[in-house]
Amino acid sequence: MEDKNRLLLIDGSSVAFRAFFALYNQLDRFKAPNGLHTNAIFAFHTMLSSLMERIQPTHVLIAFDAGKTTFRTEMFADYKGGRSKTPDEFREQLPFIKEMIEKLGIRHYELANYEADDIIGTLDKMAEAPDVNFDVTIVTGDKDMIQLVDGNTRVEISKKGVAEFEEFTPDYLLEKMGLTPSQFIDLKALMGDSSDNYPGVTKVGEKTGLKLLQEFGSLENLYENVETLKASKMKDNLIADKEMAFLSQQLATINTKAPLEIGLEDTLLKEKNVAELGQFYDEMGFSQFKSKLLADGGGEVTDETVSEEIKFEIVTDKSSVASVNADDFFYLETLGENYHREQIVAFAWGNSEKIYVSKNLDLLTEMKFPENTYDFKKNRVLLSHLNIELPLVKFDAMLAKYLISTTEDNKISTIARLFDVGHLATDEEIFGKGTKLALPDDEILFDHLARKIRVLARAKEKMMAELIENEQEHLLSDMELPLAEVLAKMEITGISVSQNTLEEIGAENEEKLASLTREIYDLAGEEFNINSPKQLGVILFEKLQLPVGKKTKTGYSTAVDVLEDLAALSPVVAKILEYRQINKVQSTYVKGLIPQIADDGKIHTRYVQDLTQTGRLSSVDPNLQNIPVRLEEGRKIRKAFVPSQDSLLLSSDYSQIELRVLAHISADEHLIDAFKHGADIHTSTAMRVFGIEKAEDVTANDRRNAKAVNFGVVYGISDFGLARNLGITRKDAKNYIETYFERYPGIKTYMENIVREARDKGFVETMSHRRRKIPDINARNFNVRGFAERTAINSPIQGSAADILKIAMINLDKALTERQSKSKLLLQVHDEIILDVPLEELEDIKALVKQTMEEAIELAVPLKVDDNTGKTWYEAK
């Protein structure tokens, strides 16, 4: 699954206020040379730096309150009344906090008549749209924000100053308070909020409010059944304060439809303004921040650094091509990211002293390319469009940076900053983005390319030194670079796709959708927009009176998990679930794949080699790794993927590779023994964990539960998570996990040791020394630390499995080349390799692929490969 954008939304007003009081007892110590108090600025910067390092957001916005008067004060005049006067020492710092935020490349925003909560809630709602791909982290000191948590949004509440946060997710909220996000609003309505000065219901505190909501589910349902309560003072208060309770509910509800003048695109994180930031630090007296800026690649923070002069030669004829040296760098520029559809717009080569730039593509046919570049795979594909075969290089700066650190992107501007080799503007600053993407004037274009060459040339020595220190140089030379060549060949080859088959599948889906629509209308008793959650909610929960599971910020939740719980209560729900699944296949894969078919009748996906933190490959334009296979309509999509003439598709898939890797690195004798004897590992686990003596007595359900335990342990699952997955009690889930570790003690030891190693070193490694940094392994926040521990446990397993697959692909490509075989590698999907194999080579190549994959690496247990062939990908799988 492709990595999501990470949106960080910060309640600037709340966090800045807490920052001020975090260092309030040192107010006189924190002063700028001009006498300005700086304690809030300093603490806010410290908090922000920590968040940026931990979350690594792609998009950030800091929201501020615009003033005391908002639409809520119009509803309730005393809203936020009675607060103490804001200290002057804090008020004077706010403008400078905002100035600092701007220089850090972060957007801040405020909106008249609305609070920061509403800005954040509205942007969070935008990030839920189906056509965007965001995970959202909200940071605040205000618990009201908890109502915004959902599957893609977590809320971190500052607990102590600005250094410690409590992370809320739907699961954590349910575990801690027994509430859903919408119920949290109702809790605030009942108990009121002394900070915001609305009273709720007299004498109802958190404990009573929770008890009422656990009994009645919602504020509305409570008041519909208030007469059923026993006579008491609480009942009298509820009845007397009904109007205030519902007003408090309105006041507590965050407005997710505020009329913002910005969108998600405006939250994109920009480069720091190094020169201005350095000057700001000087003015504030922040010497340690200035020192870190210099250490992080800010250089001498002056105007000269930002606009450091660069000299280059513009080449129009072939005379200078002969001057290319093997030790030089070369770089090819395109305007868009999808290089299968883009053309080279300019290129550059040279070293830190002498640089050449050109737009004359004819020169490329005469060039003897240097041995250093950035993104070899992209260059190999682009040059193939000109019938030029680029030899494999010795150094790829993009891949080197990826191996050194996966916690930030691998752009050349990032390399410039991390390795302190000068300032480089981002491509976004030069070319624009979205609809504003365009080539600049040649003068700007050539200057930018020349600066890229200089950064790459200056950074190489530092990058190689770090690779050698980390024992990773072999990963670059023996794995990632050869793999880049294999992937380039696969991308250039592409896979044939039948548009007619896709259209036929599409027509079948449309018929099914039309039939399902009629059935749903009949069962519902009226026509409505099935794709509208709001209209669907009215049908299910008001007309059909189905029990309300949970609510969203805008009404009834009709999420998949909610509908699955209701499926047994009404036949219309099962039909709606089926409709949704088919509709997604139709829109995303049938209609989505057809435009991706190139003129040669093939789809040429792009494999992203430098994205995931574990080393796994991802696929984009289109993503062929996410075609659904659990649904027949999804599997049918694979019928459109076909071999070349007189060939078959061969699918070879590693069996349970991650569990085999776990057996090897944990050295657990029982797991090793099961694999060595060819036992069904899930059946074996069921017998050991559930106390079943004979394999034939293991039921399908036993095996399914054991499988969930096996893979759950690999991913560091908790008893809470396992209980949800299996539909059992937490007590039973805890017993399963404890018994598992008793039966497989080597796994328990591995998990304890790898977490300890991560704490000591700050990173974990695969069997090939691929590193993943674990920055939160010592976090004080329980949830953050727990996630880091699970990541530490899983990363060596998943990463080692990914490395094994890469080794197999490299060896297989080499073997096919040596045999001068006509068979070709086409796709890599998860643990599966797909080849196009001529019929006359089929038996030999099947044996070769199986042997090559199973012998890719020697483990304590055998690797096992399952293979199938077919006239379509559907048949081969």
Swiss-Prot record:
Residues 312-468 form the 3'-5' exonuclease domain. One of its GO terms (biological process) is DNA-templated DNA replication. It is an enzyme of class 2 (transferase). GO terms for molecular function: 3'-5' exonuclease activity; 5'-3' exonuclease activity; DNA binding; DNA-directed DNA polymerase activity. SUPFAM superfamilies: 5' to 3' exonuclease, C-terminal subdomain, DNA/RNA polymerases, PIN domain-like, Ribonuclease H-like. The lineage of its organism: Bacteria, Bacillati, Bacillota, Bacilli, Lactobacillales. The keyword DNA damage applies. In addition to polymerase activity, this DNA polymerase exhibits 3'-5' and 5'-3' exonuclease activity. It catalyses: DNA(n) + a 2'-deoxyribonucleoside 5'-triphosphate = DNA(n+1) + diphosphate. Disulfide bonds: none annotated. Signal peptide: none annotated. Its EC number is 2.7.7.7. This is DNA polymerase I. Residues 180-272 form the 5'-3' exonuclease domain. The keyword NADP does not apply. PROSITE patterns: DNA_POLYMERASE_A (PS00447). InterPro entries: 3'-5'_exonuclease_dom, 5-3_exonucl_a-hlix_arch_N, 5-3_exonuclease, 5-3_exonuclease_C_sf, DNA-dir_DNA_pol_A_CS, DNA-dir_DNA_pol_A_palm_dom, DNA/RNA_pol_sf, DNA_polI_exonuclease. It comes from Lactococcus lactis subsp. cremoris (strain MG1363). Single-chain monomer with multiple functions. It comes from the Bacteria. Belongs to the DNA polymerase type-A family. Keywords: DNA damage, DNA repair, DNA replication, DNA-binding, DNA-directed DNA polymerase, Exonuclease, Hydrolase, Nuclease, Nucleotidyltransferase, Transferase.
